């Protein structure tokens, strides 16, 4: 799929589309990022966003209406990166040069999360903010590696120890919904292609239902993905 189209489908998935198996999850992730933008980015004096591990920059359209510049940081193989991260994890940017660091589903793939967060802290301006999402429960998905999963307290701990104050923390898909998501994903690739869509069509509404009946407190403790905002201190 053309990368721009893939990014659009990730932002606005359809239950009948290629990403039907992730339909509800992707919608909730986008809504969380939109909420974070409304709370912390929309009226901020900080006007540069660095997407750290940018991939094909799927969330760029959410941020560009509210900031002056959005740049992608990634390893040299990614032709969409504006700034190269070297193999040692060092970003070719000066200290205190960006207002926001965006990190979406990257931390679990990084061999040294502490070094990754240290570099994010280095390039952030004083009181700049890290906007980060990463997995609590999720299936193994190397891209090209996959090292980590986080508990809610473990994620807060490693971010705080990197020199940040967590000011926002929300979970996406609580225990019951996540269990159904994993059940769906476990069966998905064992089925013939024509039946995969049917499985998603059956299970996605159930995932939505069970996620709606869980409390926010429970979801923020146990979730498939956590979204946080952390201020540099």
Name each model feature, range by range.
Residues 100-106:
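A short beta-strand submotif of the Rossmann-like class I SAM-dependent methyltransferase core
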Residues 4, 8-12, 16, 81, ...:
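Amphipathic, alpha-helical segments enriched in basic
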Residues 20, 24, 81, 107, ...:
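Short N-terminal micro-motifs specific to bacterial/archaeal maturation
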């Amino acid at each position: 799929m053309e990368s721009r189209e893939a990014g659009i489908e990730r932002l606005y998935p359809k239950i009948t589309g290629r990403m039907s198996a992730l339909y509800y999850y992707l919608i909730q992730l986008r809504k969380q990022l939109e909420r974070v933008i409304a709370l912390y980015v929309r009226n901020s004096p900080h006007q540069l966003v660095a997407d750290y591990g940018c991939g094909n920059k799927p969330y760029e359209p959410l941020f560009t209406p509210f900031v002056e510049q959005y740049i992608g940081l990634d390893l040299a193989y990614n032709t969409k990166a504006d700034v190269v991260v070297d193999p040692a994890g060092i970003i070719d940017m000066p200290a205190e040069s960006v207002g926001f660091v965006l990190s979406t589903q990257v931390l679990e793939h990084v061999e040294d999360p502490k070094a990754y967060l240290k570099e994010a802290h280095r390039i952030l301006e004083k009181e700049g903010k890290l906007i980060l999402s990463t997995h609590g429960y999720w299936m193994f998905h190397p891209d090209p590696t996959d090292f980590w999963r986080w508990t809610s307290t473990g994620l807060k701990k490693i971010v705080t120890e990197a020199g940040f104050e967590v000011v926002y923390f929300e979970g996406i898909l609580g225990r019951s919904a996540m269990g159904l998501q994993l059940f769906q994903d476990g069966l998905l690739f064992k089925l013939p292609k024509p039946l995969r869509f049917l499985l998603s069509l059956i299970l996605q509404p159930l995932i939505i239902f069970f996620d709606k009946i869980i409390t926010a407190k429970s979801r923020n403790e146990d979730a498939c993905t956590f979204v946080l905002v952390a201020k540099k201190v």
